[in-house]
From Swiss-Prot:
Superkingdom assignment: Bacteria
GO CC annotation terms, alphabetical: small ribosomal subunit
GO process annotations (BP): ribosomal small subunit biogenesis; translation
Its biological purpose: One of the primary rRNA binding proteins, it binds directly to 16S rRNA where it nucleates assembly of the body of the 30S subunit.
Biological source species: Desulforudis audaxviator (strain MP104C)
Family: Belongs to the universal ribosomal protein uS4 family.
Protein name, entry field: Small ribosomal subunit protein uS4
Keyword RNA-binding: yes
Pfam families: Ribosomal_S4, S4
Quaternary context: Part of the 30S ribosomal subunit. Contacts protein S5. The interaction surface between S4 and S5 is involved in control of translational fidelity.
UniProt keyword annotation of Secreted present: no
Amino acid sequence: MARYTDARCRLCRREGTKLYLKGDRCYSPRCAVDRRPAPPGQHTPSRRKVTEFGIQLREKQKVRRIYGVLESQFRNYFHKAERQPGVTGENLLRLLELRLDNVIYRLGLGASRAEARQLVRHGHFKVNGRKVDIPSYQVRVGDVIAVRERSKGLTRIQELLDRASENNPPAWLEYDGERAVARVVALPTRENIDIPVREQLVVELYSR
């Protein structure tokens, strides 16, 4: 599968805001957006006035990059959100939030969504007692997510378990740090999806 392999900090600088793609580094003085807020490039030109289409495109790219999905995947999520009842933009964010890799990140079991995605691919988690190694797997209300027993002895997993025990997950997730088990207790609402995007602009872009 195709994936982005260039420096992730360039993406944040391109969007002009932190997308929190590098985990702990994004909260440190080493963050590229704090050090060099101008767009990437040799001459780092100042940001020019953009058209309405350009604004919508940048917002779509921002959402796509935050969750780490390809354009074709993102378009499929949008069409699925369109078919669901309710507000399309909120439906889109909900579908992205319910990806297994994002849930692992929200639980604190990955320092970034990229790390969470890698851990899922390596088969470190179970959903309802069965190993799931598909990052895009859609969890549902009532699903139980757990770290596999054979993975708990790994140094990095132990570090993340300690991290998760101090993490404050969103209201739609419950986490038992002693057992390293989480449960999806509700569907995420826009109020508890804390990403700095204007999803309505994405809807307007795809509605052109």
